[in-house]
Amino acid sequence: MTTGPSAPERPPRREPLPRPDWLKVRIPTGEPLDRVNRLMDRGSLHTVCQEAHCPNIYECYAMGTATFLILGEVCTRKCGFCAVAKGIPSPVDPDEPRELARASREMGLQHVVITSVDRDDLEDGGAGQFVRVIEELRAALPFATTEVLVPDFRPDPIGALDAICSVRPTIFAHNVETVRRLYPAARPGSVYEDSLALLTGAAERLGGDSVKCSLILGLGETEDELREAIRDIHAAGARRLNLGQYLAPSDRHIPVKRYYSPVEFRALGEYAESLGFLKVESGPLVRSSYHAKP
């Protein structure tokens, strides 16, 4: 008796790399942490600290700081490394800018960081909401500085840049995230050169000293590719750089290919400084808004 072809065998499940000791963090508790959570819940606000499973969430919350996530908690992109939910987002909340400013005032923030999901469903990519948030913050906290971490605003990055730079945030950040070769797998829907062009546009409008970019390490890049990306970011005009370790949010995301040691991060930070970056944060737990300040 003949039988049909057998189904191909599945490749064995790849065991995740063991997490090294330097990535283990102590989880604090107490009133500062509870207070930030209450403020977020009361205003129906979100933080990227929660949505992206940031390893520094407890440290930052305990210090009374947070990075606000605007335009909802559902992203229209499907980056292979990101923990933020993907799907069809809710309509833009018109009360969000006012609630965010209120929470920032109650927290007594001196430097407010705002980021967002990608909103490819919106004509302006959400740029108008960034502008409204900054305007509300200026009214509520006139002496606070502001930092925006923005998406690539496809298909109209120039219009978005003009709008956001018109209200002059203190820091303009956009993340290249990874090396050119890994973009198709890690950042489908995004283009490496477009992200560099956005940094250049911001540097032309605000000055490179105000422009920041971040890379996550451990997605499968080579050291030569990594150094090339650092050079590309500098050539684009950014003068602030953050380098941090990729931590896979789940087994459905791109697995960690390599853990970089603190010594390796220090060497990469020194390389970036040798190129002329003015402010470099480089370490396993560093993230885009880690120790954010003007």
Per-segment meaning from a language model:
Residues 113-123, 153-155, 170-192, 209-212, ...:
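Conserved radical SAM core fold
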Residues 1-67, 98-105, 132-143, 159, ...:
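Auxiliary Fe-S-binding modules of radical SAM enzymes
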Residues 70, 81-94, 147-156, 216-223, ...:
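Active-site mouth loops of central-metabolism enzymes
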Residues 48-60, 71-86:
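Local cysteine-cluster metal-coordination motifs and their immediate loop/turn environment
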Residues 103, 117, 149-151:
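Structural motif
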Residues 91-93, 123-128, 185-187, 223, ...:
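Short, solvent-exposed loop/turn segments at secondary-structure boundaries
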Residues 86-113:
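Conserved alpha-helical substructure of the radical SAM core
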